[in-house]
Amino acid sequence: MKLFFYIFLIFAPFINSMERITISHAGEERSYLLFIPTVQKESYKLVIGLHGFSGSASGFEKETTGGFNLYAEEQGLIVVYPQGKYFYPSYQTTDPKGSPVTQTAYSSSWNHLGPLIANNKKVKMCADSSQSAPPFPSCKNQDSCYWTSCVDDSDFIKTIALKIQKEFSIGKSYVMGLSNGGMMAQLIGCQYPDIFDGVINVVGMQPHKLSCIPEKPISLIIYGGLLDKSVPPISINSSGGYFYEPIKNTVSEWSSKFNCKDTQNSKITTPFVSSETLFYNCDNDVTITAIINAKAGHAWPGITSNEGYCRSNIQSEIIYSECKEIKKISGSRYLLNRLFAN
């Protein structure tokens, strides 16, 4: 036992190490972080993890998910953490003496909105009194409800997935994300069901009346926190004035599309107090799962909602606070083990 402990201490720093990869996409430099487990396998599962609005690739791994690389090492997963486009918008505030001061803040996002509204531009995504976000430099003539960048993130993520699938022996591929990253993950599942085998959307309900449905079967876990006011799982109206599709509508449409024949409702008390609805015996043996955590808000299961707004040294060019180490992967086990089992 002591020998195992000493070996773990020797290799622990390498378990959490990642490589930063930069590629050219659509005339711009884009980057992602790559984690490869120490265990060698004939075939790996690939997981792509997408940070939330104003998050970072390294912040998603370190804080948002409670140190996802620990789970990836445990399961022998190859993980990619893409970085969303970001900029530093200015805003007005006051100094301690009450004098006006102009400051800047880091803002990042994934463009899930562009493809969703392409043929539905008349759908109203927010109330007139909504809290509008600073427009991204890549956006031209977008209305006040449009709060993401306007680059082709769908193709960027697809390009990464195909690149990794070519470079490594990949069995199955999955995409997951939190909030804006969850919205993007669901969109990727809708657009590329031939490339990905499953989606995990955490607190990322898509816009009301715009939530996408894939043309081909793909497994989905969609998770919401009952106390979430930012992107509520059961109500259309959010605290910020944006309109979101309730979880029950999304899973109803997906399960109907994939001809799911059976449904199972469960109450879970460990590791979280949650209600789960599982749709199974669907086309291609996919499963659709809705999870609502009764005691959680806008966060990854088991993690508080203020985590992930940071960066680690591997992304030192980002002007942001440095991430702390969080080692709490019960939420990742809770979600990923369910997806892998079905």
Protein language model features and the residues they cover:
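Cell-envelope and extracellular/periplasmic
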Residues: 50-55, 162, 168-169, 178-180, ...
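The feature captures the conserved acid-bearing segment of alpha/beta-hydrolase catalytic domains
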Residues: 73, 197-285, 292-295
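A domain-start/cap signature at the N-terminus of enzymes
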Residues: 14-46, 54, 58-78, 149, ...
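Alpha/beta-hydrolase fold active-site loops
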Residues: 44-47, 218-219, 288
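Sec-dependent N-terminal signal peptides
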Residues: 3-13
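Serine-hydrolase catalytic machinery in alpha/beta-hydrolase-like enzymes
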Residues: 23-33, 42-174, 187, 191, ...
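Alpha/beta-hydrolase-fold serine-hydrolase catalytic core, especially in secreted/extracellular enzymes
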Residues: 134, 139-141, 255-342
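Acidic glycine-/aspartate-rich tracts in secreted/extracellular proteins
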Residues: 39-40, 53-55, 85-88, 227-229, ...
